[in-house]
């Protein structure tokens, strides 16, 4: 089967592999998969099995400006890929490039699967602080997203909450949750990494791994650390990852210094994704401090799968879909006082949790997409 993927990200330079990287690299072992390259990130180029087609005329780093300025060129490149490579099915998750994808696919009568990996109106607005700008972005992206959904043959999405949200807008979606590379993410000994990071062997390590952006309230975690250290002087915080488009990481570093805990907060910056399990290994308690209330009801973060596959206990804000999936390894907090209390309890009873993530492997998720593609095309 010949597949065209239109990803939400710079497919070969984005520092954090998305669900599309994990699923379509697996599909590319048995299908011909093409992807246009939106050169909006400046990270190290990653290897890929996909056929990459340059789709950037104006290499602007601002996502809004990049996708707006390059929109006509994106359409031409996507149209040419569909025509020249006899594409059987198009799948993607993008706002402006999603519209280009749909219009080009319909021109050649190629079926479209729209994979909505988050609620774009809110995620697009999250990068902006000005309320008027946020509202303008949210309303504009909602209109474009609805156009894209209206003209897709099948809609897939990542969480039961997002299925319900879409139903409220009049759309039926098929659920394919995020997953985890169970060959890569597994329990590991964290002793060597503690030494490398300057963390004491007996430290109680709270940890976070992922994009360091404002939708994760890491500032509140740092503000709680002085009180936690009064109760547990061996407590330290490990933050693994970098900011994507904002200065949030630098703000957190300044906050830690202002609170006098800079020596107990370890920032690694962005790390290679394949090294991530090694950085999770020294964590005694893994954090998911998801903040925006409009996201909580539709979220099912990759972190849940990755932390769980590594056998780690999780402390999270209340994320309904994650809690529905269950697991004794999950504890919940709603405010700073509850956060400190949960850390206090868990610091006294640290331990490894069962993994049980095999059914959520990316290979299983790739098979689920494959079944949809075969249903729409009649091809294997």
What are these regions (language model features)?
Residues 240-241, 249-275:
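Nucleotide-activated donor-binding/catalytic signature segment of Leloir-type glycosyltransferases, i.e.
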Residues 186-199:
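A short helix/loop element that forms part of the nucleotide-sugar donor recognition site in Leloir-type
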Residues 22-23, 76-80, 99, 103-107, ...:
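Membrane-proximal helix-turn-helix segments that form the acceptor-binding/catalytic region
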Residues 4-6, 156, 200-225, 238:
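Conserved donor-binding/catalytic core segment of Leloir-type glycosyltransferases
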Residues 1-44, 85, 228, 319:
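N-terminal subdomain of nucleotide-sugar transferases
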Residues 14, 216, 272-279, 286-308, ...:
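Nucleotide-sugar-dependent
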Residues 161, 179:
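Carbohydrate-associated surface elements
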Residues 328-337, 343-348:
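Conserved acidic donor-binding segment of nucleotide-sugar-dependent glycosyltransferases
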């Amino acid at each position: 089967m010949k597949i065209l993927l239109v990803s939400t990200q710079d497919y070969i330079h984005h520092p954090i592999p998305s669900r599309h990287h994990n699923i379509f690299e697996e599909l590319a072992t048995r299908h011909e998969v093409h992807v246009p390259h939106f050169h909006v990130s400046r990270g190290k180029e990653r290897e890929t099995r996909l056929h990459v087609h340059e789709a950037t005329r104006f290499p602007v780093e601002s996502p809004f400006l990049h996708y707006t300025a390059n929109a006509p060129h994106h359409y031409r490149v996507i149209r040419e890929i569909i025509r020249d490579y006899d594409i059987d099915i198009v799948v993607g998750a993008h706002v402006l490039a999603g519209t280009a994808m749909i219009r080009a696919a319909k021109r050649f009568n190629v079926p479209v699967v729209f994979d909505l990996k988050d609620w774009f109106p809110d995620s697009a607005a999250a990068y902006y602080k000005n309320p008027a700008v946020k509202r303008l972005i949210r309303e504009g992206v909602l209109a474009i997203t609805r156009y894209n959904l209206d003209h897709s043959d099948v809609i897939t999405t990542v969480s039961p909450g997002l299925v319900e949200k879409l139903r409220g807008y009049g759309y039926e979606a098929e659920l394919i949750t995020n997953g985890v590379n169970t060959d890569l993410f597994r329990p590991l000994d964290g002793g060597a990494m503690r030494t490398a990071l300057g963390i004491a062997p007996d430290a109680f390590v709270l940890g976070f791994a992922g994009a360091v952006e404002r939708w994760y309230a890491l500032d509140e975690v740092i503000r709680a650390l002085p009180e936690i250290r009064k109760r547990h002087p061996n407590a330290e915080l490990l933050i693994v990852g970098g900011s994507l488009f904002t200065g949030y990481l630098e703000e957190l570093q300044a906050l830690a210094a202002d609170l006098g805990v800079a020596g107990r907060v370890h920032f690694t910056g962005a790390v290679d994704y394949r090294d991530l399990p090694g950085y999770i290994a020294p964590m005694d308690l893994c954090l998911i401090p998801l903040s925006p209330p409009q996201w909580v009801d539709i979220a099912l973060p990759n972190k849940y799968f990755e932390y769980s596959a590594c056998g780690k206990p999780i402390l999270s804000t209340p994320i309904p879909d994650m809690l529905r999936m269950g697991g004794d390894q999950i504890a919940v907090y709603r405010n700073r006082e509850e956060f400190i209390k949960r850390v206090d309890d868990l610091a006294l009873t640290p331990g490894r949790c069962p993994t049980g993530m095999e059914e959520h492997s990316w290979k299983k998720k790739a098979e689920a997409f494959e079944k949809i593609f075969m249903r729409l095309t009649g091809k294997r």
